[in-house]
């Protein structure tokens, strides 16, 4: 006689194909992952490090994902630019102050944020240098720059204009905004070239020295 054991079939574990991690993520999550990898590559090696191979290695994804989500490496670079600007625009358009804060406090909060460690640091400024240096040679990046820069200027104009209105002043708001933005960009460039010559505190004070003769005391 056969024992009962002969009639029991061994259990076979079904192997399930493991889905790659990036395939289980949403399209938006994959886009963000590639953008962050691109930012990291720019911070480390500048524009020369912004290559499909390096970005894909950093993000641990296949090369085809860049083309799928951004059409080209230039499309990804434009998305990186928009992301970098987006972080700054968030504090310009929604500064960390109470809803009933005065225009002066809102403007001061914007200046403080722009020279905080979150933005005024070696990594961030190196990324900006790499991006700025590429604008003139990259049509996709130039297009994105014009869009983001216009929004940036409008945000600064609104903050300056609100102070002027509250104080009954008539100023050339677009011109003052352009002067302010140019100063901020120049200070960032100066700090990148020779950090020992300029501190974040000094850069912040330079902005007030530009604006206070026009708007009056702000601090």
Descriptions of predicted regions:
Residues 1-29, 219:
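N-terminal intrinsically disordered/low-complexity leader segments
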Residues 33, 37-79:
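Helix-turn-helix
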Residues 33, 37-44, 91-95, 127, ...:
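Solvent-exposed, amphipathic alpha-helical segments
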Residues 70, 130-137:
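Short helix-capping/turn signature of helix-turn-helix
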Residues 79, 93-124, 173-180:
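Hydrophobic alpha-helical connector segments
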Residues 82-88:
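Short, basic, alpha-helical segments at the C-terminal edge of helix-turn-helix-like DNA-binding modules
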Residues 89, 93-94, 120-129, 139-165, ...:
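Amphipathic alpha-helical packing segments from all-alpha helical-bundle domains
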Residues 117-120, 137, 180-198, 213-219:
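Amphipathic C-terminal alpha-helical segment
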């Amino acid at each position: 006689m056969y024992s009962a054991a002969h009639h029991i079939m061994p259990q076979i574990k079904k192997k399930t194909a493991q889905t790659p991690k990036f395939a289980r993520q949403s399209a938006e999550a994959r886009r963000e992952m590639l953008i962050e990898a691109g930012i990291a590559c720019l911070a480390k090696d500048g524009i020369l490090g912004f290559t499909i191979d390096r970005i894909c290695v950093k993000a641990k994804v296949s090369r085809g994902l860049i083309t799928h989500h951004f059409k080209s490496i230039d499309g990804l670079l434009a998305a990186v630019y928009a992301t970098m600007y987006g972080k700054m625009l968030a504090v310009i358009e929604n500064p960390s102050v109470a809803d009933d804060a005065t225009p002066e406090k809102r403007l001061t909060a914007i200046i403080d944020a722009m020279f905080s460690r979150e933005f005024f640091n070696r990594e961030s400024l190196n990324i900006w240098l790499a991006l700025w240096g590429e604008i003139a040679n990259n049509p996709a990046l130039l297009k994105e720059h014009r869009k983001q820069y216009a929004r940036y200027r409008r945000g600064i104009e609104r903050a300056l204009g609100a102070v002027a209105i509250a104080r009954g002043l008539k100023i050339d708001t677009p011109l003052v905004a352009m002067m302010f933005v140019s100063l901020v960009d120049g200070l960032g460039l100066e700090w990148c070239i020779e950090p020992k010559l300029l501190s974040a505190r000094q850069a912040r004070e330079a902005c007030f020295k530009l604006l206070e003769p026009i708007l009056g005391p702000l601090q």
